[in-house]
Swiss-Prot record:
Belongs to the elongation factor P family. The lineage of its organism: Bacteria, Bacillati, Bacillota, Bacilli, Bacillales. It is found in: Cytoplasm. SUPFAM superfamilies: Nucleic acid-binding proteins, Translation proteins SH3-like domain. The keyword Cytoplasm applies. Pfam families: EFP, EFP_N, Elong-fact-P_C. It comes from Bacillus pumilus (strain SAFR-032). This is Elongation factor P. The gene is efp. Involved in peptide bond synthesis. Stimulates efficient translation and peptide-bond synthesis on native or reconstituted 70S ribosomes in vitro. Probably functions indirectly by altering the affinity of the ribosome for aminoacyl-tRNA, thus increasing their reactivity as acceptors for peptidyl transferase. GO terms for biological process: peptide biosynthetic process.
Length: 185
């Protein structure tokens, strides 16, 4: 058990029969009444976000989450195959389980698979990934003064806004948390 006063971003807890990750939290001490903790939690099974308020000092169960380093091998229909890098066991995840992460996954990429006992909860991507631009409009000379951007399609199908100097075939560093352009690789 862990006190809600010890909440921190990224902590995984069990509440109301679900497994939740703390996305955001705030300790509130009103002038009148008891203190409480307002939190934003993400359900690791469904991906849904819920706001929940706890009384200060309330105890919740800490979920025993394990992460395994695995390599993304290939897609087989709507199943995606990952291999454990230490035991070489293969794991298949459905497209619905990793829908949001698919636009960043490349073959042979190392990722963290989040496990709760024998249940697979999802995929944790690295903070940034390198993707190649397969389609974008050519940059026009002199466009850099406005500081604007144009859409570019990457090899995984992700559409990202990039500066005008980016061309087809360039490798880009993309932030996986929000899908934004970071730099050229």
């Amino acid at each position: 058990m862990i006190s809600v006063n010890d909440f921190r971003t990224g902590l995984t807890i069990e509440v109301d029969g679900g497994i939740w990750r703390v996305v955001d939290f705030q300790h509130v001490k009103p002038g009148k009444g008891a203190a409480f903790v307002r939190s934003k939690l993400r359900n690791l099974r469904t991906g849904a976000i819920q706001e929940k308020t706890f009384r200060a000092g309330e105890k919740v169960a800490k979920a025993q989450i394990e992460t395994k380093t695995m390599q993304y091998l290939y897609a087989n229909g709507d199943q995606h195959v990952f291999m454990d890098t230490s035991s070489y066991e293969q794991l298949e995840l459905s497209e619905t389980q990793i829908k949001d992460e698919l636009k960043y996954l490349l073959e042979n990429m190392s990722v963290q698979i989040v496990m709760y006992g024998a249940e697979t909860l999802g995929v944790e991507l690295p903070n940034t990934v390198e993707l190649e631009v397969v389609e974008t409009e050519p940059g026009i000379k002199g466009d850099t003064t406005s500081g604007g951007s144009k859409p570019a399609k990457t090899e995984t199908g992700l559409i990202v806004n990039v500066p005008f100097f980016v061309n087809q075939g360039d490798k880009l560093v993309i932030n996986t948390s929000d899908g934004s352009y970071v730099s050229r690789a």
